[in-house]
């Protein structure tokens, strides 16, 4: 996915993240649907922001993709901030000097 979604549009964030994690696994929409026990047209509609999605289906998709459910709803901009902060923390010595 090229264009980052609006952080306030959770359906866009979910669609972006689903596609990102799915493509990173090398999966088609059909394969993700099979892994989740859902229909391919449902996965396609969610990725196109056509349908709202039940939390139980977010959990199924997250489990199939090997991520925590919250990661599907985390704006990519926030994920980058967390990764940057985590890297900064690892590089800085602790306050105790250890």
Regions found by a protein language model. Name each.
Residues 47, 57, 76:
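DNA major-groove recognition helix of helix-turn-helix
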Residues 1-24:
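A short, Lys/Arg-rich alpha-helix, primarily the initiator
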Residues 74-98:
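Short, charged recognition helix plus adjacent turn
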Residues 56-71:
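DNA major-groove recognition helix of helix-turn-helix/homeodomain DNA-binding modules
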Residues 16-35, 60, 87-88:
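Short basic helix-loop element that most often maps to the first helix and adjoining turn
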Residues 37-53:
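Recognition helix of helix-turn-helix/homeodomain-like DNA-binding domains
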Residues 18, 32-33, 43-46, 72:
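Conserved hydrophobic/aromatic packing and binding residues within compact polymer-binding modules
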């Amino acid at each position: 996915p090229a264009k980052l979604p609006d952080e306030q549009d959770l359906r866009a964030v979910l669609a972006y993240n689903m596609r990102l994690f799915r493509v990173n696994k090398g999966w088609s929409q059909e394969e993700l649907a099979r892994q989740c026990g859902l229909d391919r047209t449902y996965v396609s509609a969610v990725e196109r922001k056509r349908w709202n999605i039940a939390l139980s289906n977010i959990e199924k998709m997250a489990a199939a993709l090997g991520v925590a459910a919250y990661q599907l709803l985390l704006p990519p901009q926030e994920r980058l901030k967390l990764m940057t902060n985590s890297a900064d923390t690892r590089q800085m010595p602790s306050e105790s000097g250890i």
